[in-house]
């Protein structure tokens, strides 16, 4: 009896994933759009992903360019400095962020799905992508944080081991740089 319950408990997440209805289409420009609807909570999560904008696109000898640029995207817009941008997001209870990985960069928001709140959050995200601020003071602060973070990582054996293993696995490839 217990092994059967354990097997069912382990398989349950797989059956839930398999039951997820993913709607797919492309807009006029060819952008692929995926939509998963769940109406249990009045929340919307939206993510815009840019394939090829990750760390594999970093210029030679300039690691962290993609990561740094992605982090700066949601630090304000041409109209709103970082503080005002964050205040606008906080006022509507939205979480707006950007990130990158090896293959892509992304920007996203989470907010209530109520139309006026959703539209304000989408507008903030849109402006951060189409009219980013790239404020000099924020850039310098992020630069110091990034350098400090990299220096701290260099002191951990697991980071050093992973970096060296990646170089061995992916010689002459951006993954290994």
How would you name each of these model-derived features?
Residues 82, 86-87, 133-151:
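Acidic/histidine-enriched alpha-helical segments
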Residues 154, 158:
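Short conserved segment of the HATPase_c
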